[in-house]
Structures are given as C-alpha cells and as structure tokens.
From Swiss-Prot:
Phylogenetic lineage: Bacteria, Thermotogati, Thermotogota, Thermotogae, Kosmotogales
The protein, known as: DNA-directed RNA polymerase subunit beta
Keywords carried by this UniProt record: DNA-directed RNA polymerase, Nucleotidyltransferase, Transcription, Transferase
GO biological process: DNA-templated transcription
Domain of life: Bacteria
Similarity comment: Belongs to the RNA polymerase beta chain family.
Gene that specifies this protein: rpoB
Subunit-structure text: The RNAP catalytic core consists of 2 alpha, 1 beta, 1 beta' and 1 omega subunit. When a sigma factor is associated with the core the holoenzyme is formed, which can initiate transcription.
Catalytic activity, reaction form: RNA(n) + a ribonucleoside 5'-triphosphate = RNA(n+1) + diphosphate
Amino acid sequence: MRKAMFGKRERWVFGKVIEPLEIPNLIEIQLKSFKWFLEEGLLDVLKKYSPIKSQIQRPDSRKNEKGFSLEFVRTRIGNPKYNIQECKDKGLTYSVPLYVTVRITDLYSGEIKEEEAFFGYLPYMTDNASFIINGAERVIVNQLVRSPGVYFVDEPTKASSGSLPILVAHFLPVKGAWLEILLNPNKKVLQVRIDRRRKMNLFLLLKTLGYEDDLELLDLFVHDVDANDEYVLLEHVGSIILSDVKTRNELIAERGAVLTEALAKKIAESDVDVIKLPMPIAMSTLKAFHRTYGENIKSEDAYIEIFRKLRPGEIPRINAAKNYLHNLYFSPDRFDFSEVGRHKINSRLRKVYKEYLKEVKKTEVPEDIEYAEESTVLTELDIVLAARHLAQLESHPELLDTKDHLGNKRVRTVGELMQNEFEKAFVKIHKLLEEKLTIYTSFDKVTVQNLVNVRTLMTTLHQFFATSQLSQFMDQVNPLAELTHKRRLSAIGPGGLKREHARFEVRDVHHSHYGRMCPIETPEGANIGLMTSLSTYATIDKYGFLLTPYRKVKNGKVTDEIVYLAADEEELYNIAQSTIEVDDNGNIVESVVEVRHAGEIKYVEKEKVDLMAISPKQIVSVSTSLIPFLEHDDANRALMGSNMQRQAVPVIKPEAPIVGTGVEAIAARDSGYVVLAKHRGIVKKVDSRKIIIERIDEDGNPILSESGEPIQDVYTLHKFIRTNQDTTINQRPIVSQGETVEKGDPIADGPSTDMGELALGKNIFVAFLPWEGYNFEDAILVSQELLEEETFTTIHIEMYETVARDTQLGPEEITADIPNVSKELLKNLDENGIVRVGAYVSSGDILVGKVTPKGESDTTPEEKIIRSVFGDRGRDVKDTSLRVPHGVEGRVIDVKVFDKEEISELGSGVNKLVKVYVACRKPLDVGDKLAGRHGNKGVVSNIIPKEDMPFLPDGTPVQIVLSPLGVPSRMNVGQVLETHLGWLGQLTNRYFATPIFDGAKEDEIMEELYKARKAAGIDVGDSKKEKNGKVLLRDGRSGLPFDYPVVVGVMYMLKLVHIAKDKIHARSTGPYSLIHQQPLGGKAHFGGQRFGEMEVWALEAHGAAHTLNEVLTVKSDDIKGRNEVYKAILKGLNVPGPGIPESFKVLIKELQGLALDIRVYDQNGNELDVDKL
C-alpha cells in the first residue's frame, strides 16, 4: 500500500497499476464541441451558402445586368445581456448576440463594402456545459448515430427457409438517396436498388457510367483462374475469356472467346499457368442482363430504362433521364457523404482499390497506396469497387461489416447538433436573401440588416433547445448525476433509432465498446442499451468517432508513448490488459500474455504484444468507477449501483467514503461544485459567503497590480440555491486564514462533496443479521441514533411562484387585504401581502396574498358610489392567493419580486412576478429508500431505539441491520468486502482507495482487520486460524449473545431521492374533472385513487352492493348525490340514495353526437330532460 492525496485528503491506495495518464476533464467533450461551433461551425455554414448573387434590372442599361454578390466573411460573438443568475430568476434564456461581417460587391462596378449585421441571439453554454433556456438549466446529450459511408452487410431473404442471405453494399449518405448494390446468391445475379425503390440489374447502371462494351463490364470483375486444374476450368465453361491465352508458339484462345469444354481441356494440357476469367457471378449477371434487355443495349437506352423504372408515369426523354440520375448521386446540392462519409469509404475500399489497380488496370502499386478520393458525392469508381468487393464477399463472409460495431457509429456532439439546426434555419433565410437582393437597384441602398430575417434563425434554434429529444432538463439531484448527464450517449433522437424498433443486438454490449462506452451504466427500462455513458478516458476525434488511449509496447517493453485509437483501428493489434505484471524497467514479466485481438481473447508471446491498456478504469464510466470491489459484483447489480448513485440526495453533513476508489476527487473536481483556486496564493479572509486569496509567486512574494496593490481573487460561494430536482446547492469553505493554496486546489466544498472528494452518502456501522422479520425481503432496520445525529437529514428547496396579470375585468392585485381570511393566516405576511423571509409555513398557509376582480353585472351606479366611498371590496374580488400545497412544511428562505419594468420579456399583461423559496427539512423516515453502491437497495421498515440494537462486545450498538439473504443470490459480494475494509478503516482511522479490477485482496483485508481488532480487544468470534471478520454480537433487548458470529463493519449508504413523505398522499374531497365530473388522479392534482374495472369485479364477487353503489356514484360522478351526501353527513341524517351519474349523461350525449335519437323516460313513460337529471 502507498499513500496519496485525493482532493485535500490522504488515502491508502491498494492499486498496483501506476497510470501514465490523468483522467481528462470529464466535460471537455461538451465544452470543446461548443467552442468549435462558435469558432468554425457557424462560419462553415455561412461559407457553404456564399456568395449569394443577384441579377438586377438597372434603369440605364440592358436587362438582367450583373447585380450584387453577398459574401460572409467572419462571425463575432457579443456579451450576454443578463448574467446566469438573472436568467434563472426571470425565466430568460442565457444567450449572446451573434454578429456576422458581410462583404457586398457590386458586380457591375466592382465596388466593395463590408458591413456587420446582427444575426440574432445564440443560446450560450455556461462554464459547466449546461444551457439556461427559459430559466431552466438544460443539457444537450450526445447522440450516437450510424456513420455515413459504405457498408457491406447480409440481409436475410423473405423467400423459402433454405435460401441464402442476400449480400448488400449499402452507400449511406448524410443527405440524398441511398444506393444499394445487391448480390443474390440464390438467383446468382448482381442487382442495384436506387433510392429504396425497385431492384434492377447492376449492369444497367454500369452502362450509364460509360462501360458500353460487354467485355469492359466483365473486365471490372476479372480474376485469375488456375489453368492447370481441369476441374476448375470446367466449372467456368460458358465464361468469356478476358485476355489472350497463348503459349510460346501458339495462340490458344483470344480475348472475347467463349470457354468451351474442348477449349478448357486444351488449355489444361498446355503449359499456360493462369488465365483471366470474369467471376462467375458477373457472368451470370451478364446473361440475365441479355435475357432482359437484349444484347446490344447502349448507354442512352440504359438511362431510359432506369428512368422508366424510377418514374413510371413520365415520358422518358434522354436529357431528363440523364439529369435525373446525375442529380440523384453526382450533384453536390442533392447528395452529400460529408467529410466523415468520404473518409470511411476511402478507408473501407482501400484494399479493393489496390487490388483493382493490379488486376483490372494492370499497374504496379506501392504497398501503402491510399484510396485518395476527395469528392463528397458518389463516384463511378466507388460503385465499381463496391460491386467488385461484393462479388468477393460471396466466398469470404468474414469480411462483412457488423452494424453494431462502434467503428461504424459516430457521435454527434452539441456543436454539430447546433450547427445542423443553424443550417436548417439559414437555408430558409438564404432563399429570402436571394429574393430580397433583386429588389435593390442601387449599391448604396443595400443594407444587410434589412435583408436578414433574424426571427427565423432564433425561432429554429430556440425550438431545438426547448423541444428536441436531445435537449433535456438537467438531472441535478447531486453533482454525479449532473456530470453523468453531460457525458451521456443516446441512440434515440432525430436521425437515430426509435425505442420500439431497436433490436436486441443494438442494445447489447459489443467488444468494440471497450474503453469507449461503459458496458455497465445504462437505464433499466425501455431504454436499456440505447442510453449509455462515455468511458472515463474516452474522447472524440474530428470525425466524431470514439477514441480510447493505449500505451505502445515495443519488443515486450511498455513505453510511455500513448496512442488514441478508434474502434476499427484497434482490430489490427494485440492489446494486453493494464494489470499484467511489469518490472521496474517496463519489461513484461510473463513470457506468454493474454491479449485481445479483433474481439477475441488469445495468448501470444510477449514480443508480439503491440499495445497495452492505460488503466483498469478505462472500460467503465465515472459512476461505475466509483464502486469499490466492482470486480466482485454481478453486472446487473453493478448497473443498479451506478444508477442509484445518481439518485443520492445531498445530506446535511457530507462524508467521504472510508472505502473509495480514488475517482471521487476527479468526479468532484469536474462537477463544477467544488471551488478551485485559480492561482497560487495565501488565504486572506474566509467566511461562509466568500473567500479572498492574495496571489503569490513561486518564492511566496505577493504579486502586485500596476497600481502597486497586491492582486486579490474573490470567490463568492453559493448558499442554499435550489436545483432542478429541488435539492440544495450549498458551498462551504475548507481553507483557513493564512493557508497557502496552489493553483487548482479545492478551497470550498459543494453539495455531496467533502474535502474536495465526492461524498454522496454516509459511512454507517452495519450488521448482516435477520432481526424479528423487520429486514425481511430487503427491508432495512434503522437505529434511532441516525435520527438524533441527523445522519440522513436532507434539505429540499421548493419554489412557488405567482403572477399578477391584467384580466378583462381589471388587474389582479398582490395585497394583504384579502376577503374572508382570518388574522391567523395573515400573520406571516408583510404590508404588501408577501410572506416574510424566515417564517415557518405549513400546508394551507398563504405565501402571497392575491385578489382577482370578479365580474358583477348587477351593480347600479348608486352601489358603485357607496362602494368607492366606503371601500367595501368584499364582493367584487375573489381570493386567488398562493398557498402552501398539501404535505409541505418548511421555512421561507428567499422571496424574489419582479415588477413589470424588470421583466419586459415575460410577455404582455404581466404586472408582477413573485417567487417564494421554502426549505423543507426531511429526516430519515420509515418508507425511505436507502442503498449501497453495489445495487443493494432497501426500504426503511422500522426505526428502533439505539439501546435495542444489537451491540459489539465493547458495547457499541450497530446503526443499521441488513438481511444476510440479500447477498448470495444477488452475487454482489463487493458489499461484504467493503464492509470489512470499512471497519478496518474505522478502527485504524484511515481512508482507503481500492481501484476497480486492481483493488484490495480478501486475505489482505482479513489479515489487517484481525490485527486491528486484536489491538482494540474486539476479536471475539474471529480465530487466528480462520480469519473471517465476524464478531459475536449481543441482542440489545435481552443482552444475550446471538447464536452465531455476525459480519459487522462500515458500509457507505446513500439516501435516495425516493422519499416516502413526497409520495404519500390522501384525499377526502378535492377537484373533479370538468367533463366526466370524476375525481382527478395523482398527487400533483390532489386526486383520488382509481377504482378500475377489476376492482369493481372484486366488490361484485364479494356481493358488497352498497359499497359498490357508493363508489360508482356519490364518490365518483353523481354531482347532485355527492352534495346531498355531504349535507346529510354534516346534519347527521341518513345518507340519501344515489342519483344519476354524470357518465350516463356523457354516454347519452355521445350517442346523440353519433346522430342517434336517444331519449330517457321514467317508469310511467314520461320523457325526462337529461340535462336536468
């Protein structure tokens, strides 16, 4: 073990692997991508559509004279109008103005002028990689989509079961029509499918590309055949020979001859070694082509045939046909592979290209030749190479691509998603620009600002941020939740998969995920495998492919040189694990090493190892790397552990885990909640709200400003700020006056952080023991001690707001003068009718007094005068005050009032906005959900006095009793090892770091624990021979020892956001739905419990007629009946019989709406009016 500093805490580290690379900034991908969008992305779009030219009619000369040209030169970002906090308070979007410099040229005179135009506001990313949209903090999630390029895949045929799958070469562009080349092994024919329509013979398309002659076509599929093997030659009988066959003195067959049996025998007997023949599939395709279209079809005919198939209704003309096909695949306006797609195609077809040059073009090629096409449209060669490769695949199915390989998927980050939206908007503007330009006749009158419609741009971008599936309300329960949200990869969203159509294979873990995408962290519901998380070291290259770092290994020696590889590049190498044994000089100790190669595990000599992984952590995401002893947990439970850490509510006094993994400090550093020192310096002043640090140089001397004063950095801390999920952000200083801090040191803790480390829960003393059935089936028994110590008490901040508007009957008013309200309810309000800060409020209390005018039509002028004189406001206004909802109590910690002047952006008719923040203290309670880090979750079943809890031989009571049956079947033994090591930490007063896959071993822990317990005198139940970490506990109620020794120790427990108090709900009378007149549902609407169809059957089965009657009528939608019952209960009378439920009336109305004449009669045959029943 060695010691190391994590944040401001020293830990003992068990890990043996020394990582050559620090974990990179965890939100760097988001920040870099947004920076790229501002610096390059915006301009790329503008450049793509410039110059914009217009033709104008000048009065003094000929028509259609040269007009103006607009060119976009550069972009500039202004300063935000409001700061982040103001945007949150006022419900605005945090954005910056975008200015574009436009160069206008008069094409007639050559005059040039440059102008800067305002192009609207762009939502701007905060330093924490979030956006503030309409006052709410949001995150743009990275999207994982199929990369454009060419794919070679097999598709099962719909024909009979014995048929072979069809092989497809699929060209997938970013924009434009698909092109699929198909090889059908059942029909022995090459086909092409243009734009997902009908299939046709491939040679028809090749004819249009200029391969007129049949021999030219077959040349593309030439291959060498062994001329000495007669059997092989006989298989090719009927093929056309593609080059002259000659011996030294005789020409046996010339190019173009058909190979017959006699000729085959003759060739086999001669001394010719190799002859050039077309591949059998090409030959059969040609025959099929001739059968369908005849033998002498020209390229014009081919164009016409294709046009006929694609546009059956139109008259085929040669020019129209040529243009149609050209526009489909060869025009940059209609078709685009993008840079990424071209890069993928070039690398995929490189081998085929090399072979094509050798075989078809018969040229000498260097080994390292590249397929260096640069055009982003389809080229003839792409089609030819793909077809040729497809023909080879028939006998080499192992060369097919896997759709789910990460090499074929790319990540669309924030920058790219915003660029796409900007381009969508700009295309609309571009068309308008062209039209508007033609209006101007004089150069001096052209002003860009008048040409650009800013609204279009802003609406499109705003719509994306407000409504896109990829723009999500930020998960802010704790710092880890926020960090993970920004590192999320989603396969769903526009242009991605749909939840319903996602196959099992797409969701599954793939070997190419290694080091790029976490195989563990993913949701448990419908999105399993579609929403994933980036691995700790993963980064993204310029094309959007995921990269992971490796160390180079040369001749069995590990170097410190690091290379980043994409998933498809990695397939070529032998890669060793990071945990293999290496001596001090970097030489691999074992002579034979286990390596990964192309998704397989194999053993090779150490000299053949090419690369080595950086760290055992590199496989998993940040959340998962926070689970100690992950290697001892089942993957399903680790998944739950990863997900539940994100749901841990920040407790009042955060406590870092005794048993950590070493990643805690890094997660806290990048979460943005820990305040880090920007410069080296000395702490001059500290209080709970701000820290002042005076900068110093290397020698400790103060750094002075130009005026000779020492430079001071002031850090303002956040105090009790509400998050998106109503948890609390509160920062506390962790430095003292006079302390020297280095640049990057933590100087203040945030929520769920302790001494600069992530601290999501508490270290709790636990025992694994069944206790009177109170911990049956994952229930948890808790000691009263945890309540007294406020261990799991959390603070939640609720925000309530109300708006005073102008109504048709007059303005609403915020006032303390509310009609028919007792003095008791007004005691906490100030003279303006707004609750005072510091007041303790509970459900039903008034937070903001508000009255709304209600219309009264029968007021005579005399009444109006009397009212205005005596100020009798009682009858013309109704009380619409903001009240504390049911089940909430707490202290008012802040009130914000905004007047009309401050909130001009809020929309018309709003006079005042009041926001009241109430902090609620929620101690641990029965029904709350607790969990460990290993997916071991449970619900508190009972809280019993400390003196009744089982206790150690030295009298220490345990704090939580867990069921031992929760461990074996779930296979998350990590929790038991954590418990032992945690106890060792508590006894020796140490903190540990046990990195995943490289942590403490069981015997190490037991050895040390036995020593520590012996020293403390609590080694009863543990023998020197068989160290098991168990102890003889006594029952707190009787004082008698339990029958067997019990595992006790310290486990890190989290209180999750599923708090019983927030979920419990009861209703007596409440709101009803407008049409059905049935009670609403759900706690939010103060609704009732649904008594559904099956529940009705249950009561019917029991014969509970009166109960059933009541449930279906007066408790539901019999309006008259429920009022009568209410009166009867108040007056103590018998409950009257039921009336007619509203649902009956609704049914009648619906049937009448279907034009059926339905009427209702009483028993005497008199017609009744449904509306009056």
